Amino acid sequence: MTAIVEAFGKPHVNVGTIGHVDHGKTTLTAAITKHYGNFVAYDQIDKAPEERKRGITIATAHVEYQTEKRHYAHVDCPGHADYVKNMIVGAAQMDAAILVVSGVDGPMPQTREHILLAKQVGVGYIVVYINKADVADADMIDLVEMEVRELLSKYGFPGDEVPVVVGSALKALEDDSSEYGKKSIDKLMEKLDEYVAVPPRPVDLPFLLPIEDVFSISGRGTVVTGRIEKGEIKTGEEIEIIGLKATQKTICTGVEMFKKLLDKGSAGLNVGILLRGTKREEVERGQVLAKPGTITPHRKFKAEVYILKKEEGGRHTPFFANYQPQFYLRTTDVTGSIKLLDGKEMVMPGDNVSVEVELQVPIAMDKGLRFAIREGGRTVGSGVVSEILE
């Protein structure tokens, strides 16, 4: 069991509210915490604390609540730009998103943008809450549901299966006992519990460790250190060293932590791993150790990126096609060039765009890997791999 499960005695899921401005994301967050958590007032959520991830400041409010079956951590962002940054930078990885759509207005531009981003960054499940049902016309609500389902299907979510709950976050917040009031929140929680699968714990995934440092210990061989990102490793297991150069195979002959030898190392631990027959110069920071056959090195990929504004410490000027910054992937900087898509000629600070990246050397990667874009050692943007090209 993970530490989180032990702490709450229940499986843990990360969720977030997404949707167009003023459709009621924060009111819904307040209503959920009122009935299922430690109540957090609307104006407290709206004064979200600032969180820094990779040098990027994002205002995010974290609240928590629980049903009989699960514990949920919930993130709500005050501004649209913060949602975009949060999803790309992954300040809070969302396992599922609650898409809030006003029953009066229906889907709007940010509704689409948030759905597309959710898909690109790997949010697994979406549950829909059609809000403001108390002031919307019944026919309009049916139409909105149809439109939202079509939109979800268009962006690769199972639009026909996605649960849709109709209600009024404001009524729920006011303790109204009608169908659109507290009952709609109960129904939403029920749907989250039923529809969203608990994500596999990192320890159950295949072993992966990004190498941070390499040492040579006389008489014992080469030791690499780093934090195990996922899975576990036992002495005697075969592993691959991937990225930067040709993939090599080796055997783990020991796992150490604080000078003690362990039987195995698992996700979340900072460890040293002894490698059999591997020379000091054959391994370097930026490579990863992984279970054989589970991850491959790549140079070309598509990504969703957010470029910092000048006020956020980013560039002061736009960049153009073939811009060549450094990409900080896991533990190392690699130079690469950016190709702009969809006929775009330049990218302004503050923009969120889809790009193609070609690195100078291959790096172990999967869809969903997050990275920082740096120039002269400072972060100028952030991104997430949306598709591997080669």
Swiss-Prot record:
G3: region residues: 76-79
Superkingdom of this protein's organism: Bacteria
Keyword Metal-binding: yes
Keyword Protein biosynthesis appears in the UniProt entry: yes
Record-level Gene Ontology MF annotations: GTP binding; GTPase activity; guanosine tetraphosphate binding; translation elongation factor activity
Organism: Wolbachia pipientis wMel
Domain tr-type G: 10-201
Subunit structure comment from the entry: Monomer.
Location(s) in or outside the cell: Cytoplasm
Name listed for the protein in its UniProt record: Elongation factor Tu 2
G1: region residues: 19-26
Ranges where the record places region G5: 168-170
Keyword list, A-Z: Cytoplasm, Elongation factor, GTP-binding, Hydrolase, Magnesium, Metal-binding, Nucleotide-binding, Protein biosynthesis
InterPro entries recorded: EF-Tu_GTP-bd, EF-Tu_GTPase, EFTu-like_2, EFTU_2, G_TR_CS, P-loop_NTPase, Small_GTP-bd, T_Tr_GTP-bd_dom
Catalysed reactions, as listed in the record: GTP + H2O = GDP + phosphate + H(+)
Enzyme Commission number(s) of this protein: 3.6.5.3
